[in-house]
Regions:
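Bacterial N-terminal signal peptides
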Residues: 8-17
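Intrinsic disorder/low-complexity signature
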Residues: 3, 24, 53, 96-99, ...
Length: 236
């Protein structure tokens, strides 16, 4: 009886080991989530994280291979070890990139941010930035799917941006979101190629685009809790 129990125990260990090995092989051979590689080579991708051109070719090639294979945790580790891009991911945080997308009337997007400059809590905050997530058929991506670098309650504002017409004089770039900063990612993002404001020399703010009649902004939440009176405010 003792020999039988020992044999059963041995067999269980063997079967478990085989199952784990099989699972590992399946994971290694799983198809990449990256189905469209926007960057044609390692140097094109490097332009998104190495503007000073200091990263050697061997490391560039390694990063490019990990990016194409969708090995996000390994890629983030490489960035941390080599202190790259201030900790941010390459490719503006996106994969399966589609460039020069149009903005059409009725489309809605959302984002988290603070105000530009000092905000006293009176009047409309000045809101800037150019990365959003699309709201598709009413679906709002979770905070974790956005893979942002701060906790949700660190952001003063969560707001919705509605496109009012087909007249925006610039395009966008859409992508799936790279998992990063301990967040699951894999949501969708749209980068707005917003031009400079001649009066300031900086990228136009969302307020400026609203003033020009292209968009409407609605502040939905103050995740930080700092500005509850701003919730429901419409900037147009």
């Amino acid at each position: 009886m003792k020999k039988l129990l020992n044999y059963i125990s041995f067999l269980s260990v063997v079967l478990f080991s085989v199952a784990c090995t099989s699972s590992t092989i399946e994971d290694e051979n799983a198809p990449s989530e990256v189905t469209t590689v926007f960057y044609k080579n390692a140097d094109e991708l490097a332009a998104t994280y190495d503007p000073s051109n200091t990263v050697n070719q061997t490391l560039r090639n390694q990063i490019y291979d990990l990016y194409k294979q969708g090995k996000w945790s390994e890629l983030e580790s490489v960035f941390k070890v080599n202190n790259l891009n201030g900790g941010w991911p390459p490719a503006n945080g996106g994969y399966n990139i589609v460039d020069n997308t149009d903005f059409t009337a009725g489309q809605k997007y959302d984002r988290y941010s603070g105000a530009i400059g000092t905000y006293s809590g009176t009047g409309a905050p000045t809101l800037g930035g150019n990365f959003t997530s699309p709201i598709i058929n009413g679906y709002v991506y979770t905070f974790a799917q956005r893979a942002l670098n701060k906790p949700e309650n660190a952001y003063d504002f969560y707001y919705e941006i509605e496109v009012l017409n087909n007249l925006l004089p610039f395009k966008g770039q859409s992508a799936d979101i790279i998992p990063w900063f301990g967040q699951v990612g894999k949501g969708k993002q749209t980068m707005w190629k917003i031009p400079l404001d001649p009066s300031t020399g900086y990228t136009k703010t969302w307020n400026k685009l609203a003033q020009e009649g292209y968009i409407k902004i609605t502040i939905k939440k103050s995740p930080s809790g700092n500005y509850p009176s701003a919730v429901g405010m419409v900037i147009q």
